[in-house]
């Protein structure tokens, strides 16, 4: 046995064991190498550590602030800069470890300290262009505690949870490094640039007050739950007529299955949905069809996996963390169980401003919806509106016509609207009532449809938070709609017309166009949990099921279904606004009857468009038609007579000039990807496999040994992970039962 330290032999021995003690009393690197030989074979093991030098003090290179900077003139070089400090003092030392130095803590990779500040930086050279390197910072805090963190500005991160994701979701994903701890950053110089089409480069965003927004959760819209699968539905979105798609949060979040309101890295796309290139493909295809893309951002809070939260974690250490508000001191109670960003801190504001600008520049998104915007604050909430204006100015600096939509319920909403932003307007209760055939609303109440008839406020019949209107119609609707699907779904175009043909920006949650009738508070076994009001169904499930898997809708879109008939009519109604007469709807309606408690409601856009609907569950209604020449848009006929009789649940749309009714598909045949059997490919190298089936929470619910096929027939419907070994590697596949 031979032991070397920094290349010099320090001890030799004969046998199978050696003991050696060395006092690490001098600053520097210590590289140990132990060699064992029996005369014919030799084995070597190495270990390295260091006693840190005091960090070199040096100004950051010009233009380097915080994050990852690639040198366009040198594709073998990257500059890293990170903030590492408490409210009162910087860290003692910061090192970078990664694939480029075998994850070794070394003085050679200690970051320089910028001007006695809490910013530390380093230039890495000699990297292979386009090669991916995993890396982390090792921070020695001022109190001596050592933390490993990713880069706050990471565009791709890895986590040990990635092994649970099907490989097809993110092809060729770099394996998680054995030496990693928590989230690790991936850097890559000379990354190929995405080629945007002219449709994106020259995209003209729809007028903000003429938006018809389709809120979409990537996980639930297709069985495959990916950006790539959404690409297969572009005709569907185009036929529906919406001119904006709002994606629920897609930034990296904890775990692999979430709404996304638990973010940890704001510059990285969550890998469960696919690659950044696939997201760009989706955005580009939307632009080719005149559809803007809005993304939902969560700047109120983060999880404890954010690198700045890891550095001084939630709990006792949080009081030292300049990035977050202290628990118990924040003026609002929203999300107080997660680290709450301190927006008084300059680097916090800089990060989020850069985040907005990054998504506009890198992904060509068209705007943002800001979750829980009324909760954004510093140590007080006195300046919330000014803070929103600060961020809006950052957006406008990059793109003057980008959308800024706020989930802002406070009285300050009018101030923000006057500053050019849009605010959410929750009108879902009104549309639940009209869907059920209960129309005795009172002006000014939540069931008042006129609240959805104004510029600058995004009104909606459903959002991800609200109950499904046609679930309520199925449960508590008037007359036959609780038992007759055709009657119930036949009311969908009526409800949608009196949303999408009103004034101002409008929104609905995906599948509202089909009259989706599963409760938001119902899981995949059709059991209900508590709703937002704490009401639990008679089935007694004691949990919130809003994020649980819901039933699939692909069979509804086949030719001849009542849902497909509703979709066809809804698409024609929306296209009237977004494609055929957008200039009309960019103005203001001249008259509307929305709040008088009568079954008959009307909307009039001068001599251009007249809409009438009968919201009753029984009994016809007669409407007086405004004077002039009118054409029945949905029937492609000229209107004769001065009155129209409407059946229960019927809507009529008249136009002042004859326009072509858009041709709609008879149906769609989308992939279902639902399999009861997972076939495991046989190989000549291995015998039959041992298979384990897990729930998404990690619970083992099935074990099968020596099998070539895993039979899932006996399991409840839902999403599972099937794990087995192949060629010495553990393989995990996500399967929908």
Predicted regions and their residues:
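Short beta-strand segments within Ig-like beta-sandwich modules, predominantly Fibronectin type-III
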Residues: 10-16, 110-115, 702-706
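Basic K/R-rich, polyanion-interacting modules in nucleoproteins and related proteins
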Residues: 50-94, 149-209
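Aromatic-rich carbohydrate-binding modules that target alpha-glucans
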Residues: 80-130, 140-165
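Substrate-binding/active-site clefts of carbohydrate-active enzymes
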Residues: 156-158, 193, 197-364, 373-383, ...
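Active-site-proximal helices and loops of the catalytic beta/alpha 8
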Residues: 251, 259-261, 291, 355, ...
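C-terminal beta-strand-rich structural cap/linker in extracellular carbohydrate-active enzymes
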Residues: 641-662
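C-terminal outer-membrane/trafficking sorting elements
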Residues: 660-737
């Amino acid at each position: 046995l031979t032991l070397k330290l920094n290349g010099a032999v320090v001890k030799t021995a004969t046998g199978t064991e050696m003991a050696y003690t060395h006092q690490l009393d001098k600053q520097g690197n210590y590289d140990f190498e132990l060699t064992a030989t029996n005369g014919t074979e030799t084995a070597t093991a190495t270990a390295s550590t260091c006693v840190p030098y005091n960090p070199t003090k040096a100004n950051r290179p010009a233009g380097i602030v915080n994050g990852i900077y690639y040198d366009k003139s040198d594709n073998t070089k990257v500059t890293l800069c990170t903030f590492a400090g408490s409210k009162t003092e910087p860290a003692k030392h910061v090192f970078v470890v990664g694939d480029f130095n075998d994850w070794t803590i070394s003085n050679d990779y200690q970051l320089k300290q910028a001007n006695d500040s809490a910013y530390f930086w380093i230039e890495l050279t000699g990297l292979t262009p386009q090669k991916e390197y995993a890396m982390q910072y090792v921070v020695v805090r001022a109190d001596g505690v050592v933390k490993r963190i990713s880069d706050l500005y990471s565009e791709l991160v890895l986590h040990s949870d990635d092994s649970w994701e099907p490989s097809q979701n993110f092809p060729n994903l770099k394996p998680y490094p054995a030496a990693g701890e928590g989230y690790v950053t991936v850097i890559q110089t000379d990354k190929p640039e995405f080629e945007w089409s002219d449709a994106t480069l020259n995209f003209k965003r729809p007028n903000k007050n003429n938006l018809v927004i389709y809120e979409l959760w990537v996980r639930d819209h297709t069985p495959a739950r990916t950006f790539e699968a959404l690409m297969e539905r572009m005709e569907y979105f185009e036929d529906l007529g919406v001119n904006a798609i709002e994606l629920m949060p897609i930034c990296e979040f904890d775990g692999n299955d979430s709404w996304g309101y638990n973010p940890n890295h704001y510059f990285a796309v969550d890998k469960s949905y696919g690659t950044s290139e696939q997201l760009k493909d989706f955005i580009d295809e939307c632009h080719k069809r005149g559809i803007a893309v809005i993304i939902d951002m969560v700047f109120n809070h983060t999880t404890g996996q954010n690198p700045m939260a890891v550095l001084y974690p939630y709990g006792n250490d949080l009081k030292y963390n300049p990035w977050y508000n202290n628990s118990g001191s924040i003026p609002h109670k929203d999300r107080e169980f997660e680290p709450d960003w301190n927006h008084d801190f300059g680097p916090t504001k800089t990060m989020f401003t850069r985040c907005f600008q990054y998504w506009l520049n890198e992904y060509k998104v068209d705007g943002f919806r800001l979750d829980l915007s009324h909760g954004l604050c510093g140590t007080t909430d006195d300046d919330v509106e000014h803070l929103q204006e600060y961020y809006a100015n950052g957006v406008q600096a990059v793109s003057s016509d980008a959308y800024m939509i706020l989930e802002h319920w406070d009285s300050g909403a009018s101030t923000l609207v006057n500053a050019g932003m849009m605010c959410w307007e929750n009108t879902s209760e009104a549309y639940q009532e009209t869907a059920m055939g209960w129309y005795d609303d009172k002006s000014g109440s939540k069931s008042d449809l006129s609240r959805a008839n104004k510029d600058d406020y995004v009104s909606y019949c459903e959002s991800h938070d609200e109950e499904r209107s046609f679930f309520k119609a199925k449960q508590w609707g008037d007359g036959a709609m609780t038992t007759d699907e055709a009657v119930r779904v036949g009311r969908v175009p009526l409800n949608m017309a009196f949303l999408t043909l009103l004034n101002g920006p409008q929104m609905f949650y995906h599948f509202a166009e089909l009259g989706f009738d599963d409760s938001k508070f119902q899981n995949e076994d059709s059991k209900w949990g508590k709703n937002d009001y704490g009401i639990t169904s008679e089935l007694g499930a004691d949990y919130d099921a809003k994020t649980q898997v819901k039933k699939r809708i692909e069979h509804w879109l086949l030719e001849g279904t009542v849902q497909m008939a509703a979709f066809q009519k809804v698409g024609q109604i929306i296209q009237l606004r977004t494609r055929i007469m957008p200039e009309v709807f960019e103005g203001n309606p001249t008259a509307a009857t929305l709040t008088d408690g009568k079954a008959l409601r009307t909307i009039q856009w001068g001599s251009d468009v007249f809409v009438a609907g009968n919201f009753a569950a029984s009994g016809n209604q007669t409407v007086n038609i405004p004077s002039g020449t009118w054409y029945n848009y949905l029937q492609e006929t000229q209107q004769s007579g001065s009155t129209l009789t409407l059946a229960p649940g019927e809507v009529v749309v008249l136009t002042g000039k004859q326009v072509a009714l858009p041709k709609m598909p008879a149906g769609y045949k989308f992939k279902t990807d639902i399999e009861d059997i997972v076939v495991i490919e046989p190989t000549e190298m291995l015998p039959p496999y041992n298979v384990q089936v897990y729930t998404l929470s990690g619970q083992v619910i099935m074990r099968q040994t020596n099998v070539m096929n895993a039979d899932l027939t006996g399991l409840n419907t839902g999403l599972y992970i099937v794990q087995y070994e192949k060629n010495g590697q553990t393989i995990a596949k996500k399967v929908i039962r």
